[in-house]
Amino acid sequence: MAKVWSKRFDNTLNPFIEKFNASISFDKKLILEDLECSIAHAKMLGKTKVLSSSETLLIINGLEKIKVEYLEDKFSPSLPSEDIHYCIEEKLISLIGETGKKLHTGRSRNDQVGTDLRLWLRKEIDNLEILITDLQKSFLNLAKSNIHTLIPGYTHMQRAQPLSLAHHLLAYLEMFQRDRERFQEVRSRVNISPLGAAALAGTKIKIDRNFTAEELGFDKIYKNSIDAVSDRDFCIEFVSASALAMSHLSKISEEIILWVTDEFSFAKLTDKCATGSSLMPQKKNPDVPELIRGKTGRVYGNLQALLTMVKGVPLAYNKDFQEDKEPIFDTAETISSSIKAMTILITEGIEFNIKNLSESVQNDFSNATDLADYLVCKQVPFRTAYHVVGEIVKYCLEREILFKDLKISEIKKFHPEFDEDVFVDLEPFNVVKSRTSEGGTGFTQVEKEVNNWQKKLLL
């Protein structure tokens, strides 16, 4: 099959180079977007009288027929077509004859592929908006049922202060909200039309770029034709936003992996979201969070690939840009499937061990700050109180006891302001309850945030 550019050359491509050069194996994913783009372009050529009304109708009907054949598995793009764009053009010419050769008037594959990729990515971002919202709802529902469940809070992976489990889960809603907002911002820059920029300099053909932009649902057009065909910022921004979202999914995955270990025993996985071992019959493996954690590296790699691809590439379009699609496609699939898997895991795959969680906050010094705050509330300077409590912790460690094991006479030796009610303040439930500052882990604050999120997510 002759290439669209073959008349310039005397010899045919080396078969290996032909395959190496082709993108049809992966850019065929853009077939529906390419058809959508071409239909809008044909309508515009008809509107500006570049095509007659009969030619316009013939081309549009031909493109619609190709779409039907593709959806019915009667048309499968493949080699020797170089890419999806010329594959469709060849198919159109075979269906309607010479008129099909007029479709490419006033455009280049450079602006065409940029348009196709933006249309495809826009749909993916809109789908991610739905998926992330569902993920947030799953976390919120789990939080609602665990407002008064206590869990150790950690810094440096060392016990720090007790928390409401709901408060811990709500932290992820905040992260996912930032992810949603980032994708929305990326969408605003995806939704700009390069169509009509042609190869790099625009065209002398009478076209209406604003018409095609409106037909395809773009917010506006690129104002510089060189920038229009060479811009891949939107690809990098999408993968960057995805990388951050994956980092958040990886973070909760790591926590779940820890929580379900025998050493922590804070939770267990249900049979719906766990697998076993081919050798060890007792095993129940957290494959879902492990896979999400592992897949995060793929997205990071895709981001590095795209950043390297555009580094040092001169204006305008270069063949390097053919390498933008596979990282984009892989990232979109990875982030979407990971979000879906995490939503299922949170909804029906994890059960918290309330008894172990409750016991875990009873047997440590994570209430030490509250012991200091007790003195602060009695007008003792914080740093003085801090040092006093440090001495008490050391005293207890040397004797292998906890604060609750101390007698009032013992604790008074460290500071006279201590009284019997100090032990009430040190109860983990009361410790958490007392954190009433806005955004804190106190139950009233957590309930307030749960209500706020219910309104935000329309639950």
Curated annotation (Swiss-Prot):
Q: Which BP terms does GO give this entry?
A: arginine biosynthetic process via ornithine; L-arginine biosynthetic process
Task: Please give the catalytic activity noted in the UniProt record.
Answer: 2-(N(omega)-L-arginino)succinate = fumarate + L-arginine
Which compartments does it reside in? Cytoplasm
An example of a GO molecular function for this protein is: argininosuccinate lyase activity
Has the keyword Membrane been applied to this entry?
no
Q: In which pathway does it act?
A: Amino-acid biosynthesis; L-arginine biosynthesis; L-arginine from L-ornithine and carbamoyl phosphate: step 3/3
Keywords attached to this entry: Amino-acid biosynthesis, Arginine biosynthesis, Cytoplasm, Lyase
InterPro entries recorded:
Arg_succ_lyase_C, Argininosuccinate_lyase, Fumarase/histidase_N, Fumarate_lyase_CS, Fumarate_lyase_fam, Fumarate_lyase_N, L-Aspartase-like
Give its E.C. classification number: 4.3.2.1
Which cellular component appears as one GO term in the record?
cytosol
Q: Which domain of life is it from?
A: Bacteria
**Pfam families referenced in this protein's UniProt entry, alphabetically:** ASL_C2, Lyase_1
**Principal EC category:** lyase
UniProt family annotation: Belongs to the lyase 1 family. Argininosuccinate lyase subfamily.
Protein name (database record)? Argininosuccinate lyase
Recorded name of the encoding gene: argH
